Amino acid sequence: MMFLRNAIFAILIVLIKMDASIVDKDLIERINKGEEKAFEVLYNSYFVYLCACANSYIFNPVEAQDIVNETFAKIWYRRGELSFPIHAYLIRAIQNGCLNYLRSLHSRERIIDEYREALL
């Protein structure tokens, strides 16, 4: 069942069209200068695609959107440091966000288990 779910998400990621042609060196330079409109173009170009990527890791669409939004917030706060091309950076940032989310789930489960044992 898990294999089928992964295969479906992989297909969805391929089918989702993102307009990467809009994201060029000039756009990244404008973001680095703090231009909000340029950042909005980047966000709108990648949001759906990155949500699908994140969801393929964690299988939770709400959390996937949160991870993508947190990633974009970090990008905005670190503007001035972005370089072109940005696609690989975005994918890696989403992967790291998903791994951090999964680690936090594991930690929470472990704490709950320890608490239950202490109560017994």
Model-derived segments and their meaning:
Residues 1-48:
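N-terminal module of bacterial RNA polymerase sigma factors
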Residues 32-40, 51-68:
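Short, charged helix-capping/linker segments at alpha-helix termini
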Residues 32-33, 70-86, 105-106:
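Sigma70-family region 2
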Residues 41-45, 70, 118:
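Alpha-helical structural segments
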Residues 42-46, 50, 86, 94:
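Hydrophobic/aromatic residues within well-ordered alpha-helical segments
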Residues 50, 54, 90, 94-102:
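Hydrophobic-face residues of short alpha-helical interaction/recognition segments
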Residues 81, 95-113:
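Arg/Lys-rich amphipathic alpha helix in sigma70-family domain 2
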